[in-house]
């Protein structure tokens, strides 16, 4: 069980982090308790052996979700992962460096642009931009 915070019921801004969005005049004080699971447990319970494309948009909690897919990732059973990096990562205290280090051994990272994919070969502090952007992690093998 976890707390989920939002500005109103059904809001697309919901997050497990109580975000300070007062600079946007958004009050993030609504709270509800939700049930959560891991990708590994969900796949095991539902007999899912392989995931071709996994899209994550969990408002800053992406790295924690990925850690809950340890067995599937270690076994090479997830091929492509799309995730978002942006302002929510300020609240979760995660940096792009954390994602780069998580993926660098088995995945090639790309930033999704309007005209295609930009490969991310090496980490640089210039990647620490907290404006929402989507990334792909594509399994190397």
State where each predicted segment sits.
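Phosphate/nucleotide-binding beta-alpha loop and adjacent structural elements of enzyme active sites
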Residues: 1-141
């Amino acid at each position: 069980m976890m707390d989920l915070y939002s500005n109103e019921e059904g809001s697309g801004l919901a997050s497990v982090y109580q975000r300070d969005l007062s600079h946007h005049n958004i009050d993030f004080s609504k709270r509800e308790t939700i049930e959560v699971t891991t990708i590994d447990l969900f796949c095991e319970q539902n007999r899912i052996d392989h995931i071709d494309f996994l899209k994550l948009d969990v408002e800053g909690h992406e790295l924690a979700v990925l850690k809950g897919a340890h067995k599937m990732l270690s076994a090479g059973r997830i091929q492509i992962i799309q995730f978002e990096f942006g302002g929510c990562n300020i609240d979760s205290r995660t940096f792009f460096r954390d994602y780069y280090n998580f993926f660098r051994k088995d995945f090639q990272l790309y930033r999704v642009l309007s005209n295609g994919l930009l490969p991310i070969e090496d980490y640089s502090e210039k990647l620490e931009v907290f404006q929402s952007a989507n990334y792909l992690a594509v399994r190397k093998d």
